[in-house]
């Protein structure tokens, strides 16, 4: 049994056999190639030479895949830093929209179409209810982020929304209720359920849905109607996970959800020639962590379920926080609230400068003597370079 293994290790061992058995789509193959070759030199290298002692440093480039566990830190930090300019010192709420597991097979068969529908319906629900004077009577702003996994990497599509707890009324004045979240969860759940099932019905009537695997039975109109009726009868889980106040709290909180992948390296405990052991949350036992053992190919299959469609945008901004509105309207809200503007610290910085700001490491200094590290001149260091690369 091997200890301290990573997702890259698991893919290197089990993905080749998984690919032979399953013939995955091209974007899954690309993701696997990126994960297996990240920081191995396959994506190029950066060479630096010390001007004083001649020490050579070689840094293997990362793959930059959004599904790679080794490539999320920089995008996360840059994204969070960019949001500082749009965050207000006002209440924020974390609302989660989920769908019944009965819809999982249809959603997985139509990922791009029905993921987009999740965003659209969650947005329509929040907009409709927040504009109702009975609840708030204002235009609000929020960020939606799709996650498709549960703790065990099972398929569990749901939308995380970070909702600004106030907005602009018809007179362009700031309005908030204070205290608890301004929308009743039961009302949100019913409206979201109705809108999403109406969307499914419309797509089925327009013959836009595909049915694969266990979803094939829903090509039959009677079976599809039975499914919708069953989902109408269920209570859809919509809840507010946390309430927090203050810009810095929001900024710190955002990082937990924006650039997550299905599983991180630290949750993988070990692997054998045939199995992988990782830890999952046992929600039936107060959320305690427990170890789970599955076959290596099953681990790959579960991971691949959560690779997003090509060019799919997972983080979307709406209302006051949309690209069209945030420059003018957030500035107006800030003036009304008397908030100070948070200034980005990473804007326009390159990777070397970001490393220095975030980790206080100067990669331009030699680790041996403290001299300046520079890119080598081919005529002066070509022999040393080739000798190093052969090692």
Predicted stretch roles:
Residues 1-391:
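Beta->alpha loop/short-helix hinge microenvironment recognizer with preference
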């Amino acid at each position: 049994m091997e200890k301290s293994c990573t997702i890259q290790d698991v893919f290197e061992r089990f993905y080749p056999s998984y690919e032979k058995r399953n013939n995955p789509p091209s974007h899954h193959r690309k993701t696997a190639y990126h994960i297996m070759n990240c920081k191995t030199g396959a994506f190029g290298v950066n060479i630096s030479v010390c001007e004083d002692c001649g020490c050579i440093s070689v840094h293997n480039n990362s793959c930059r895949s959004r599904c790679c566990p080794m490539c999320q830190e920089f995008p996360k930090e840059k994204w969070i830093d960019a949001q500082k300019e749009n965050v207000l010192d006002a209440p924020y709420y974390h609302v989660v929209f989920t769908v019944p597991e009965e819809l999982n097979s249809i959603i997985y068969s139509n990922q791009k179409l029905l993921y987009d529908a999740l965003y659209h319906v969650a947005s329509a629900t929040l907009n409709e209810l927040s504009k109702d004077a009975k609840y708030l009577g204002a235009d609000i702003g929020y960020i939606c982020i799709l996650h498709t996994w549960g703790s065990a990497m099972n398929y569990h599509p749901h939308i995380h929304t970070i909702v600004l707890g106030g907005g602009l009324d018809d007179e362009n004045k700031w309005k908030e209720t204070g205290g608890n979240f301004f929308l009743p969860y039961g009302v949100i759940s019913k409206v979201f359920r109705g809108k999403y099932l109406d969307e499914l019905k419309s797509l089925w009537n327009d013959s836009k849905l595909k049915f694969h695997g266990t979803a094939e039975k829903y090509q039959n109109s009677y079976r599809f109607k039975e499914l919708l009726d069953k989902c109408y009868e269920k209570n859809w889980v919509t809840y507010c996970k946390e309430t927090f106040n203050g810009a810095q709290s929001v900024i710190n909180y955002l990082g937990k959800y924006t650039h997550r992948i299905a599983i991180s390296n630290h949750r993988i405990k070990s692997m054998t020639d045939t199995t992988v052991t990782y830890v999952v949350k046992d929600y039936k036992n107060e959320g305690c962590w427990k170890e789970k053992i599955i076959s290596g190919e099953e681990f790959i299959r579960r991971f691949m379920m959560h690779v997003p469609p090509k060019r799919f945008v997972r983080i979307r901004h709406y209302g006051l926080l949309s690209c069209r509105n945030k420059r003018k309207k957030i500035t107006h809200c800030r003036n009304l609230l008397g908030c100070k503007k948070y200034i980005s610290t990473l804007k326009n910085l390159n990777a070397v400068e970001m490393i220095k700001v975030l980790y206080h490491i100067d990669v331009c200094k030699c680790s041996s003597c403290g001299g300046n590290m520079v890119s080598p001149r081919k005529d002066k260091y070509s022999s040393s370079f080739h000798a190093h690369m052969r090692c």
